[in-house]
Amino acid sequence: MRVILCLGETLEERQAGRTLDVVGAQLDGSLPASFPPGIKAKDALIVAYEPIWAIGTGLTPTNAEIAEVHGFLRARLIARFGEAGQDMRLLYGGSVKPSNAAEIFALTHVDGALVGGASLKAADFSRIVLALDAAPSRA
């Protein structure tokens, strides 16, 4: 079984400058101290940053904000799991659409996306998948 752990802040928490504190506490409170022998962290857990205020609203954090949170999460995973934390997948969710997917996938530490509403239209979803395939880290 592979778990997708979704982390995110409310609009009020973001406006108060608490995003990293909130997602850091969510991550720390949800992670095991270690994984059982024979189970690789990257195979057991995927972490997704999905700001609550962006879900279904059409609003998206800036690319700089997404990169900041993903860099923070990557550092936290490495601190917790060592090299295994580098290999764990980090996804972004929160109003991913064909018009912004390529820019989001080009960000460091963004390994994919949780796609909501855009997945309901085959053409839109296909464009998002193609954007992921073309992302620099996957070329």
Each model region followed by its residue ranges:
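Active-site loop-to-helix "anion-binding N-cap" substructures in soluble metabolic enzymes
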Residues: M1-A139
